[in-house]
Each structure stands twice: as C-alpha cells, then as structure tokens.
Amino acid sequence: MDLEAQIAEAIRTELSRQTEESQGRLTVADADQGLEIHGPVDIEALAMAIAGSVAGGP
C-alpha cells in the first residue's frame, strides 16, 4: 500500500471511530470527491492516527 493510501485509510478509520463515540454529533459519509463530514472532529486524535500510519504504527 502506498503512503497516500495508508494516510487515507488512517483518516477513514479514525473518523469512523470518532463517529461511533460521538453519540450522533459527528457524521461521516462518502461523497463524490472524498468524505462529507458534519460535526466536531478531535483533530489531535486524527493527527495522531495519521502520524501513526506514516510511522508504521497500528
């Protein structure tokens, strides 16, 4: 898997996790050119997920 694909997967996985924990305040859906996101996103957790994917973490 190339770097872009790893980062995209990390973003999708983290946003999915945040969606499950948000009690309906965050929604994420596939859109024509990416994702459609509504609600609060924990940007620090998202950044850590991206950094972990680049560094080869889980």
Question: What name fits each language-model region?
Answer:
Residues 1-58:
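Protein-protein interaction and targeting regions used for scaffolding, dimerization, and localization
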